[in-house]
UniProtKB/Swiss-Prot annotation:
Places the protein is found: Plastid, Chloroplast thylakoid membrane
Gene Ontology, cellular component aspect: chloroplast thylakoid membrane; NADH dehydrogenase complex
Function, in words: NDH shuttles electrons from NAD(P)H:plastoquinone, via FMN and iron-sulfur (Fe-S) centers, to quinones in the photosynthetic chain and possibly in a chloroplast respiratory chain. The immediate electron acceptor for the enzyme in this species is believed to be plastoquinone. Couples the redox reaction to proton translocation, and thus conserves the redox energy in a proton gradient.
Gene3D superfamilies the record matches: NADH:ubiquinone/plastoquinone oxidoreductase, chain 3
Gene: ndhC
Protein name: NAD(P)H-quinone oxidoreductase subunit 3, chloroplastic
Membrane topology note: Multi-pass membrane protein
Gene Ontology biological process terms from the UniProt entry: photosynthesis, light reaction
Length: 120
């Protein structure tokens, strides 16, 4: 309980980081002119009238590819701090990180075998 003052900078940053986008949306909502009409409700495609329907179905393969990318992108987020403090943490954290990477490699092999990485 006595160490809570060490987090004052964190809470201040969190509050400011939350208030900036809220204030930006609120101020733009107050100052922006409101114009409604058929031209405002129509689709816009590079300055020309849209051709065809706007709703397209994407193949599930794109979603699987994106999901695999996000998983390994998050892996990088977790491994970067570990790599920066590798010499301080010791062997036990190295073993934990190795197990983490091993689990992700098993997941990558599974996704590869299932064809989630095939683009064609």
């Amino acid at each position: 309980m006595f160490l809570l003052h060490e987090y004052d900078i964190f809470w201040t940053f969190l509050i400011i980081a939350s208030l900036i986008p809220i204030l930006a949306f609120w101020i733009s909502g107050l100052l922006a002119p409101v114009s409604e009409g058929p031209e405002k409700l129509s689709s816009y495609e590079s300055g020309i009238e849209p051709m065809g329907g706007a709703w397209l179905q994407f193949r599930i393969r794109y979603y699987m590819f994106a999901l695999v990318f996000v998983v390994f992108d998050v892996e990088t987020v977790f491994l970067y701090p570990w790599a920066m403090s590798f010499d301080v943490l010791g062997v036990s954290v190295f073993i934990e990180a190795f197990i983490f990477v091993l689990i992700l490699v098993v997941g990558l092999v599974y996704a590869w075998r299932k064809g989630a990485l095939e683009w064609s």
